Regions:
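N-terminal low-structure segments adjacent to metalloprotease catalytic domains
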Residues: 1-103, 197, 202, 275
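Hydrophobic alpha-helical segments with strong N-terminal bias
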Residues: 48, 52, 168-169, 260
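Broad hydrophobic/π-residue packing in well-ordered secondary structure
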Residues: 8, 13, 103-105, 184, ...
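Soluble non-cytosolic domains of exported or imported proteins
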Residues: 61-70, 169-177, 181, 268-273
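Generic low-polarity alpha-helical segments
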Residues: 1, 190, 209, 213, ...
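Pan-zinc metallopeptidase signature
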Residues: 242-275
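Acidic/His-rich structured neighborhood in mature extracellular/periplasmic domains
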Residues: 75-246
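Hydrophobic transmembrane signal anchors and adjacent membrane-proximal interface regions, especially
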Residues: 1-9, 18, 120, 136, ...
Length: 275
């Protein structure tokens, strides 16, 4: 069952109801997305100031209590002001044992985080679903793999923690394990609801009701960037459909060598296969 780390909202149950229930619908006669008057963006609470950890924790939903405890410790001891400020772009933070992959959901305005990024002990890890990301086999027919890493002093920041080792992780390590994830998902949130658009939010509408006109009009910052700096490689666009959306690779795509793909990539403007 869903729970929460710490809630001061008038209706604490609304946080779970508005973000965690499987029957949320945004079209037809059964539309039941919560309006911002029920669950506002955090920016509407802070007026754009850097939110306090308590204000952020008021928006946390977890599947197991330890997830909220660890997340709060991470924010209080490791998070910088820029990470805290980015939380203004969400309505809630959901951390769950069944969430994989992590994602931002524009219908609710919330981010949903894989608890595997937050465990400290083997016992905590034991409750987390071990099923792989459903996208992990999408590139099975391709002859190349995209590689990436995050580094500090030119050293990979990630450490290996085999499940059979039963070893614990230190809280300070979670900044490496979860910091990149927070920046990634919170960047999605600020793309769909950028700071400049937040003062004019309509609280009678849901998060998606406020976002959808901008999305449909291609007014998101990512849309403007794509228009100003368009990607050039049609082959890479097709490969992205295979690797990230599950399209079936055709014969041409299956025949691309790593050198072929490197050539497509090096002459284009992207910084990564997946941003």
């Amino acid at each position: 069952a869903a729970g929460w780390a710490d809630l001061d909202l008038d209706d604490a149950g609304a946080l779970v109801r508005c973000t965690y229930e499987a029957n949320l619908q945004y079209t037809g006669g059964s539309t039941n997305l919560c309006p911002l008057s029920t669950l506002p963006f955090l920016h509407q609470t802070t007026s754009g100031a850097v939110p306090t950890v308590d204000q952020i924790m008021d928006r946390v939903v977890v599947s197991h209590d330890w997830m909220g405890d660890v997340f709060e410790q991470l924010l209080r001891t490791q998070a910088t002001q820029d990470i805290l400020r980015l939380f203004n772009g969400v309505t809630a933070i959901v951390i769950g044992a069944q969430v994989r992959p992590s994602f931002y959901y524009a219908l609710t305005g919330a981010i949903y985080l894989d608890a595997d990024n937050f465990w400290l002990t083997a016992a905590q890890r034991d409750v987390i679903n071990e099923a792989p990301d459903f996208r992990s086999d999408f590139d099975r027919d391709l002859m190349y793999s995209g590689v990436w890493r995050y580094t500090q002093n030119n050293q990979n920041i990630f450490l290996a923690f085999p499940a059979t080792s039963r070893i614990s992780r230190d809280l300070t390590y979670l900044l490496a394990e979860a910091g990149w994830l927070l920046y990634h998902e919170l960047a999605h949130a600020s793309d769909y609801m950028p700071p400049a658009a937040r003062p004019t939010l309509n609280s009678s509408l849901s998060a998606w009701g406020n976002i959808s006109p901008r999305y449909e009009a291609a007014q998101l910052p990512s849309d403007l960037m794509a228009a100003s700096f368009p990607l050039q490689s049609a082959p890479l666009g097709g490969l992205a459909q295979v690797k990230f959306f599950g399209a079936t690779a055709d014969a041409t795509q299956r025949a691309y060598t790593p050198n072929d793909v490197a050539g497509f990539f090096s002459s284009d403007r992207a910084t990564d296969e997946y941003n």
